[in-house]
UniProtKB/Swiss-Prot annotation:
The gene is COBL8. It is a lipid-anchor; GPI-anchor. Residues 1-25 form the signal peptide. Disulfide bonds: none annotated. The keyword Electron transport does not apply. A lipid is attached at N629 (GPI-anchor amidated asparagine). It is found in: Cell membrane. It comes from the Eukaryota. Glycans are attached at N58, N116, N164, N194, N307, N320, N349, N391, N403, N421, N464, N543, N553. GO terms for cellular component: plasma membrane; side of membrane. This is COBRA-like protein 8. GO terms for biological process: cellulose microfibril organization.
Length: 653
């Protein structure tokens, strides 16, 4: 009896073990490789949809579904594929929750919306070797990226395939992908014949060009730590950064032990104390550790710290986070700082160094930058510190390339005015956003066009303009919408005023207003005048010059003269309880000749800019231009006398 019972128990356990094995194998078995992969003599890329299920909440109009997919990148070519990158054009409002063996090249952390498509970069193994160099070892030739995420609207058994998948590495050409069955999208990419094979197959990738580059140079390496120098360099003609904030993500539990030339925005070692770092480094005083955050934020030091022997004394450091374009000052177009990094097991050898991923950089009222993954490049060269006429190579170097993207919405706006119209065309309604909430929509109109203003309203904060704006509308017989249009919500506004237009030339007046709480040091503005720029003569209170942008001499660059390079923040009036706040202001008249621009139509269009940038950030422009008042000659004098009295009357009601 006992023997029979033991036998039955053994049968049950064996069945359970077999079932577990089968279930495990069913879940983990990768999809079989396509036969087309063997026919591809380049890089074979495929996207395979594996499974999907309905998830909460239940919503017939906007139902979410979990999806699991796999990206395969197989190098069947003759040359090693360095730092592979694959673009996937998702099409169903996908939210990516996890991805193995890859990171998002734009630095986004998961979960992340990828509905507009995204680029995957290989990590931790970024390079795919060839069959020739590995004797056909597929594990070194191939990368498999397992994706888990959420998509909307495609219920099983339908398959939410992306619209496109392609290799984006330089030097490769990919045709339109083909669909195999219902769940596979694949493409075979081959070397671009216009690029030599030697360039593709070289040991390191060539340094790339971009609006902003970041070099991560390892200068000293030890078993459990290393030192690195980070160089941020601006290459854009009109781009800049103010109060730059640089962040990245450690991938293997590294932590920031010390810094020179920059500083973490938050000094905190608590994540190490509660994490594996304190268990391994038992004798380390973590009170001296700079940051244990997985994504530390690094900021520049103030000028006063440049000669500080503890945190400063680094060339190109300590400038309050200001990086100017080379067109303004080449010496101030880069920032440099140094860090000391502690590693964790199992990477405790000198050669095991993993650069941080997901780089992001931003500034205060500056262009938005999108950064790619760090790419291994040839080691940087540094002058020998001993003074000998030789260079010293970095232990290893990686380059991060960042490019400017046009944000939506912008952060500055422009108003237009002219000598032939007594009203100002103001900045657009909601020009800089801030109008999406229901509360805002209930208090003002987000769609009504901004009301024309009298000139003196430009000096008054938007919230205090209501009475003056209404009075001006009544005076000009304009209908006042209810509710009134929302404000522009911009931290900086620029007024372009067409001042004169005569036979031999014309003049304009540019006024910059700072409505924010931060001073702008070494500010600049760039104005594109497509037809009028060749006639530029002089900016009387600014330093002005013509610069070539994209090969065209159509842009006037203006910056503050020595001693006038500060655009101060908004401040209280003399009597804060009664007076309006006062914006920081800079103003100059600029003159043009018509000798080089015959036939120019100054008043109708050519005298107004087609693009305006402030500190590298493109500003919102009005949709209409000032027009000539046919009756203005009869009433202008009367209005000039009456307007101040109306303003005074309505502002004191």
């Amino acid at each position: 009896m006992g023997l029979t019972r033991n036998f039955i128990l053994w049968i049950l356990l064996s069945s359970l073990f077999t079932a577990i094995q089968l279930t495990s194998s069913q879940r983990n078995t990768p999809p079989p490789r396509s036969k087309d992969a063997d026919l591809c003599n380049g890089v074979f890329v495929s996207y395979t949809y594996l499974t999907g299920t309905k998830i909460k909440p239940n919503d017939t109009k906007n139902q979410p579904y979990r999806f699991e997919s796999e990206i395969t990148v197989l190098n069947n070519g003759r040359d090693e594929l360095k730092s592979w990158q694959v673009f996937v054009k998702f099409a169903h409002r996908e939210i990516l929750v996890s991805a193995t063996n890859a990171v998002l090249s734009d630095g986004s952390s998961l979960p992340a919306s990828v509905e507009n498509g995204t680029i995957f970069a290989g990590f931790p193994s970024a390079d795919l070797k060839t069959a020739i160099m590995t004797a056909g070892d597929v594990t070194q030739m191939e990368a498999r990226v397992e994706l888990v995420g959420t998509q909307f609207g495609v219920a099983p058994p339908s398959v939410p395939l992306p619209k496109n998948i392609t290799l984006v590495n330089d030097g490769w050409s990919c045709p339109k992908p083909t669909q195999q069955g219902s769940n596979v999208l694949q493409v075979c990419c081959t070397p671009n014949p216009n690029i030599t094979t030697s360039k593709i197959g070289q040991k390191f990738l060539p340094r790339q060009e971009g609006d902003l580059t970041i070099m991560y140079d390892v200068t000293r390496a030890y078993q459990s730590s290393y030192s690195a120098q980070v160089t941020i360099e601006n290459h854009n003609l009109l781009g800049r950064l103010d109060n730059w904030d640089l962040s990245f993500m450690w991938m293997k539990d590294e932590f920031l032990f010390s810094t020179k030339g920059a500083y973490p925005s938050v000094v905190d070692s608590s994540d190490c104390i509660t994490g594996p770092q304190a268990k391994y480094y038992k004798d380390l005083d973590f009170s001296n550790v700079m940051s244990c955050a997985r994504r530390p934020h690094i900021i520049d030091l103030p000028l006063t710290k440049y000669n500080d022997t503890n945190v400063g004394r680094i060339p190109y450091c300590c400038r309050n986070g200001t990086i100017l374009p080379r067109s303004m000052d080449p010496e101030k177009s880069k920032s440099v700082f140094q860090i000391e990094v502690y590693k964790m097991p199992p990477d405790l050898n000198i050669s095991s160094i993993t650069p941080p991923q997901s780089w992001q950089i931003k500034g205060n009222l500056n262009p938005d930058y999108k950064c790619g993954p760090p790419l291994r490049v040839s080691s940087s060269q540094f002058p020998d510190t001993s003074g000998l006429p030789s260079n010293k190579s970095a232990f290893a170097s990686w380059q991060v390339v960042c490019n400017i993207t046009q944000p939506t919405p912008p952060k500055c706006c422009v108003s237009f005015s002219s000598y032939f119209n007594d009203s100002v065309i103001p900045c657009k309604t909601c020009a800089c956003g801030g109008c999406s909430s229901d509360r805002v929509a209930r208090t003002c109109s987000t769609t009504s066009p901004a009301l024309p203003l009298p000139y003196q309203a430009l000096l008054i904060p938007f919230d205090n303009r209501t009475k003056l704006t209404n009075a001006w509308a009544v005076l000009k017989n304009r209908k006042v919408p209810d509710p009134l249009p929302c404000g522009d919500n911009c931290g900086v506004s620029i007024n372009w005023h067409l001042a004169t237009d005569y036979r031999g030339g014309w003049t304009a007046r540019v006024t910059l207003f700072n409505w924010g709480d931060t001073d702008f040091v070494d500010w600049f503005t760039a104005v594109e005048l497509r037809n009028a720029a060749p006639g530029f003569q002089k900016a009387y209170s600014f330093n002005g010059s013509i610069i070539a942008v994209n090969g065209k001499n159509t842009t006037v660059l203006m910056e503050g003269l020595p001693g006038l390079n500060y655009l101060l923040a908004e401040k209280d009036g003399k009597n804060p309880s009664e007076d309006f706040r006062i914006p920081g202001k800079q103003q100059s008249v600029i003159s043009f000749t018509k000798k080089l621009t015959p036939g120019i139509k100054v008043g109708s269009k050519d005298g107004f800019p087609t693009k305006v940038l402030f500190n590298g950030q493109e500003c919102s422009l009005p949709s209409v231009l000032p027009t000539s008042n046919s009756h203005r000659k009869h009433v202008s004098t009367f209005l000039l006398i009456l307007t101040p009295f109306l303003a005074l009357l309505f502002l004191r009601i």
